Regions:
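Short coil/turn segments at secondary-structure boundaries
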Residues: 1, 16-20, 40-43, 75-76, ...
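GT-A fold catalytic core of metal-dependent nucleotide-sugar glycosyltransferases
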Residues: 1-2, 47-52, 69
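A short, conserved acidic/glycine-rich loop-to-beta-strand motif
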Residues: 2-9
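Amphipathic alpha-helical interaction motifs in eukaryotic regulatory proteins
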Residues: 5, 35-40, 60-64, 101
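A recurrent flexible, glycine/aromatic-enriched loop bordering the glycosyltransferase active site
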Residues: 15-29, 92-94
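Alpha-helix capping and helix-loop boundary segments enriched in small/acidic/polar residues
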Residues: 21-26, 47-54
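Conserved nucleotide-sugar donor-binding
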Residues: 23-42
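C-terminal catalytic/acceptor-binding lobe
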Residues: 51, 57, 62-298
Length: 298
């Protein structure tokens, strides 16, 4: 018997309901044997829990009676957040993306688009290559001392310094919790403060379009219109990273059908420049590859 899902992103919500409950908005998956057992016991079971709120709460109680724990799947997302979801989307866990809930409370996902247009592009990217959608890849430009952090189907972040993967894994708190709290302890996952220093902030390239080219998925990421090149040059004593680049084109090869059984962050490399466009390639790490930091910096 298997009970699959994920708790809320909000620590308060998990404390109130349960850290071991699959929240219904993010999605719940039950194995056939568990479903069959519930079919025999559910009607009587829910009578014992009249004070519980919501079908997911009652379902969790009855599954607990059967002695089945939650198998947490990190691709289910009961967001329970408000504001700018950038920090979560840019730092998706290494797991297949499955669902999100409460998108009505967050800002449009992509700059320059309204909420509906953003969700249409988001869905297009997801359907074009579901397995690798929002998967991360980190590589480095050793000569310019840059970090390129890709979240497929969403954004490419170019940092003006070398940042190692453990720091990049943490989600930047660009959002607040559903109950409008923003402190670190309110979130049930690893977070970090918003980078306030202009000289350390990344330059962002957001997805503009995505398409298939044979079995390769290609995405066009356009430089954010919020440019502060002059300020960076004056106050940081250097030009912003990739100041001559307006577009990054990312080509991604398909993942194996068994990737999710032993997931690993993807590998990537810069392929070259043509005029104002940077070309990158993302793929599943091959045998003997030790990761971007080892391969690029040592």
């Amino acid at each position: 018997m298997v009970y699959v899902g994920a708790p809320s992103k909000s620590h308060s919500a998990n404390n109130y309901f349960s850290h071991g409950m699959a929240f219904g908005g993010g999605g719940v998956t039950l194995s056939f044997p568990l479903t069959a057992a519930l079919a025999r016991t559910l009607d009587v079971c829910i009578e014992r829990y009249p004070r519980l709120y919501g079908s997911d709460d009652r379902l969790h109680a009855c599954i607990t009676e059967l002695g089945v724990p939650l198998s947490r799947e990190y691709g289910f997302h009961q967001w329970d957040i408000r504001g700018n979801a950038h920090g979560i989307l840019a730092a998706h866990p290494i797991a297949p993306f499955i669902s999100i809930h409460h998108v009505e409370f967050v800002d449009p996902i992509y700059p320059g688009l309204n909420s509906l247009e953003s969700l249409e592009l988001f869905t297009k990217a997801m359907k074009t290559e579901p397995m690798s959608f929002l998967q991360r890849s980190v590589c480095y430009d050793k000569k310019q001392k840059l970090t390129l952090d890709i979240s497929l189907g969403y954004v490419v972040q170019v940092y003006p310094s070398v940042l190692l993967p453990p720091e990049l894994e943490r989600s930047e708190r660009t959002y607040i919790a559903f109950k409008r709290m923003s402190q670190r302890t309110e979130f049930d996952f690893d977070t970090k403060e918003i980078q306030k220093s202009m000289c350390k902030k990344p330059v962002l390239f957001f997805l503009k379009d995505v398409w298939k080219d044979g079995n390769i998925t290609r995405g066009s990421y356009i430089r954010s219109s919020e440019r502060d090149d002059l300020k960076r040059k004056v106050f940081c004593f250097r030009s912003p990273p990739l100041s001559d680049i307006d577009e990054i084109q990312v080509s991604a090869s398909p993942l194996s059908k068994r990737w999710h059984l032993a997931p690993r962050r993807l590998c990537s490399a810069v392929k070259g420049y043509v005029n104002d466009t940077l070309f990158m390639f993302v793929r599943q790490c091959g045998r003997g590859a030790f990761g971007s930091a080892f391969d690029s910096l040592d």
